[in-house]
UniProtKB/Swiss-Prot annotation:
Record's function text: Confers resistance to the different beta-lactams antibiotics (penicillin, cephalosporin and carbapenem) via the hydrolysis of the beta-lactam ring.
Organism this protein belongs to: Bacillus sp. (strain 170)
UniProt cross-references to InterPro entries, sorted A to Z: BcII-like_MBL-B1, Beta-lactamase_class-B_CS, Metallo-B-lactamas, NDM-1-like, RibonucZ/Hydroxyglut_hydro
Gene Ontology biological-process annotations: antibiotic catabolic process; response to antibiotic
Alphabetic keyword roster: Antibiotic resistance, Hydrolase, Metal-binding, Periplasm, Signal, Zinc
Protein's name according to its UniProt entry: Metallo-beta-lactamase type 2
One Pfam short name: Lactamase_B
Subunit structure: Monomer.
Family to which the UniProt record says this protein belongs: Belongs to the metallo-beta-lactamase superfamily. Class-B beta-lactamase family.
Co-factor remark: Binds 2 Zn(2+) ions per subunit.
Signal sequence interval, chain numbering: 1-30
Length: 257
């Protein structure tokens, strides 16, 4: 892995003990539909959904305040191994996710990027460390993780950090406070895919969701910073809900009004 830090400031078939079928990604714009492959575990609590040959969305069903909530991250299939954006709700789900993707792609998970210190992102940190997987985060996320009783990720990401995993380029960006004090987003420049995490709401979201640690008055500015930095977005992956396009950022701004 090379690192350069910037800025100081349905048809169903059996596959790998899972279920594969054809589905679609819903966009904010109804005219944009992308056919995809979805692979699920036997219980339906974990799925990976193909965005392109090398980028998949991983989704796990966890529970928040007694309600079942699906949470999204990314799986990057690089020439040097697999990289995840976010772990999962807990160590059990994270362990099963790792085993599932390693079996599917016949590669090891080498690195994970943690986008903030809530359970749906960092809940599997112990499972990562047990496997020797590098867990990248900002220093603030590492600090907040420790305060919440989690093992600490590396704390090696700056305001903007450019990473390279084999042939795959990744940029992490801290646009400012919003869903949490520490939320970052992940940009894949080769594919123009933005993993917005919980800072970005899905098209079907009617409200801002969990705002217990939110900075609602600063959230809009952070979204605007993302729009200024990433002007040519192909797909946006929200922390929860369906994949969309740039319209998800605009929808989030509407919810903040």
């Amino acid at each position: 892995m090379k690192k350069n830090t910037l800025l100081k400031v349905g048809l169903c078939v059996s596959l790998l003990g899972t279920t594969q079928f054809v589905s679609t990604i819903s966009s904010v714009q109804a005219s944009q539909k992308v056919e995809q492959i979805v692979i699920k575990n036997e219980t339906g609590t974990i799925s990976i959904s193909q965005l392109n040959k090398n980028v998949w969305v991983h989704t796990e069903l966890g529970y928040f305040n007694g309600e079942a909530v699906p949470s999204n991250g990314l799986v990057l299939n690089t020439s040097k191994g697999l990289v995840l954006v976010d772990s999962s709700w807990d160590n059990k789900l994270t362990k099963e996710l790792i085993e599932m993707v390693e079996k599917k792609f016949q590669k090891r998970v080498t690195d994970v990027i943690i986008t903030h210190a809530h359970a749906d992102r960092i809940g599997g940190i112990t499972a990562l460390k047990e496997r020797g997987i590098k867990a990248h985060s900002t220093a603030l996320t590492a600090e907040l993780a420790k305060k919440s009783g989690y093992e600490e990720p590396l704390g090696d990401l700056q305001t903007v950090t450019n990473l390279k995993f084999g042939n795959t380029k990744v940029e992490t960006f801290y646009p400012g406070k919003g869903h949490t004090e520490d939320n970052i987003v992940v940009w894949l420049p080769q594919y123009q895919i933005l993993a917005g995490g919980c800072l970005v709401k899905s098209a079907e979201a009617k409200n801002l969701g969990n705002v217990a640690d939110a900075y609602v008055n600063e959230w809009s500015t952070s979204i605007e910073n993302m729009l200024k930095r990433y002007r040519n977005i192909n797909l946006v992956v929200p922390g929860h809900g369906k994949v969309g396009d740039k319209g998800l950022l605009l929808h989030t701004l509407d919810l903040l009004k």
